[in-house]
């Protein structure tokens, strides 16, 4: 069973980052995804006045569950939107781990050399974003 949960303990977040071979960002918020109690990935992100930044959306070493990462990415985006931040950037480090195509499936588009998503109404009409978030 897939479980995506917020990571509130910073030492736990640091351990999960090590398991995902990514840098620990102590001032970032974090979600972790587990399948049958096994860590499959994490998402570190920041809420900022000019928009949120997804710093990392990455797999744990030895795992390849892209469905879990997709769900965790969308959960992160929903959290960001619900907290009043309606623009979100997919940082270059996050893109390097996955791919531009994966970010676009989440709903991001290229704008000004970066990947952005406008979350205004994004979760009100999910069908509006096409299959797996890609524009129609």
Regions found by a protein language model. Give the residues of each.
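Conserved acetyl-CoA-binding loop-helix of GNAT-fold acetyltransferases
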Residues: 64-81
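Conserved beta-strand-loop-alpha-helix junction that forms the acyl-donor binding cleft
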Residues: 89-100
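Conserved donor-binding loop and adjoining core beta-sheet/short helix segment
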Residues: 32-67
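C-terminal "cap" of GNAT-fold acetyltransferases
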Residues: 106-136
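Short acidic/polar active-site loop segments enriched in Thr and Asp
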Residues: 86
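Short, aromatic/basic amphipathic alpha-helical patches
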Residues: 98-108
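Short loop/turn microsegments at loop-to-beta-strand junctions
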Residues: 27-29
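Short amphipathic alpha-helix that is part of the acyltransferase structural core
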Residues: 1-25, 126-136
